[in-house]
Structure formats: structure tokens, C-alpha cells
């Protein structure tokens, strides 16, 4: 069973030891999205939602999620993050889709891909939570890693769809 990195000799879960790895600058950006109806879109851009500023709250949720990733992903190392940025862009060409990009960085011994993915997911979930009173039919779209840099495995950039 030793060919599995997160399973010990007894077949039980373990978190890998990264103490011998080099400290390098590591960055990851993840994408998620949520498609809403026109009324929700208008509430968000006009800042008229009864629960408050939807995008500011969602940004805070994404930041908190990145910082707490190791508490919800079992084999994820707790990291000292040095930067977290949540960015939004509306696509209103055929629907009302809010595209979310979460960028996380650190100087450390392991990457921040899971932190970026968790941040993007929590941001979309928070938009849903704050607007679900108007419509429960919103759709959270694909969540995926866009880029990562640093570390032994090198850089990654997702191919365009």
C-alpha cells in the first residue's frame, strides 16, 4: 500500500510530510460561477439586497474559506497564506452569470490549489445563500483550477475551452 501518498503501511490515512521540501512562492487561481435571474442580478448591481452587499459578503466568505481550507479538506496542510483576492466579472450576453476568480498565494512547502478552489466555491455558495429568497433555481457552474505556479511540479495553465 505504500504507493499511495496519503495511506500508511497499515492502510490508514496519513498526511504527507513536507518538512524536507523547499520553501517557494506558490500561487493558484481557481474559477467558479453562478447564474442568477435578472431580478437577482439587478439587486446585486444596485446593492438593494435585504441581506446587504452581496459581492462584498461573498468576497469575505471566499477569503475566510481559503484561510480555513485545512479544516474541511482532511489531507490539506494548514498554510500561512500571504494573499487572497476574489474578483468578479458579469457575463450578461445570454444569461446573468457571475464569474468568480479566486487567487491565493503563499511562500511555503506545498501548493495553494485547494485554497483557491475552496475560496471560489464558497464565494459562489455565499451569493446563492444571500439571494435564495428570490429564486432557489440559481445554478452554480463548474469550479476548476485556472493556473498554479511554484513548487516541484512546476507551473500549470488550464487550456481555454
From Swiss-Prot:
The keyword Ubl conjugation does not apply. Keywords: Lyase, Molybdenum cofactor biosynthesis. It is an enzyme of class 4 (lyase). Pathway: Cofactor biosynthesis; molybdopterin biosynthesis. Catalyzes the conversion of (8S)-3',8-cyclo-7,8-dihydroguanosine 5'-triphosphate to cyclic pyranopterin monophosphate (cPMP). One of its GO terms (biological process) is Mo-molybdopterin cofactor biosynthetic process. Substrate binds at residues 75-77, 114-115. It catalyses: (8S)-3',8-cyclo-7,8-dihydroguanosine 5'-triphosphate = cyclic pyranopterin phosphate + diphosphate. The active site is at residue 129. Its EC number is 4.6.1.17. One of its GO terms (molecular function) is cyclic pyranopterin monophosphate synthase activity. Homohexamer; trimer of dimers. The gene is moaC. This is Cyclic pyranopterin monophosphate synthase. Belongs to the MoaC family.
Amino acid at each position: 500500500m505504500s504507493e499511495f501518498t496519503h495511506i500508511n503501511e497499515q492502510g490508514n490515512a496519513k498526511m504527507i510530510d513536507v518538512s524536507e521540501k523547499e520553501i517557494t512562492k506558490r500561487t493558484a487561481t481557481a474559477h467558479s460561477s453562478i447564474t442568477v435571474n435578472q431580478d437577482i442580478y439587478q439587486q446585486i448591481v444596485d446593492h438593494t439586497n435585504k441581506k446587504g452587499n452581496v459581492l462584498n459578503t461573498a468576497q469575505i466568505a471566499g477569503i475566510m474559506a481559503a484561510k480555513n481550507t485545512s479544516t474541511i479538506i482532511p489531507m490539506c496542510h494548514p498554510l500561512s497564506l500571504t494573499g487572497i483576492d476574489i474578483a468578479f466579472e458579469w457575463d450578461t450576453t445570454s444569461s446573468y452569470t457571475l464569474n468568480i476568480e479566486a487567487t491565493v498565494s503563499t511562500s511555503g512547502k506545498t501548493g495553494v490549489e485547494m485554497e483557491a478552489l475552496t475560496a471560489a466555491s464558497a464565494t459562489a455558495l455565499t451569493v446563492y445563500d444571500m439571494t435564495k429568497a428570490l429564486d432557489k433555481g440559481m445554478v452554480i457552474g463548474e469550479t476548476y483550477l485556472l493556473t498554479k505556479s511554484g513548487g516541484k511540479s512546476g507551473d500549470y495553465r488550464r487550456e481555454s475551452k
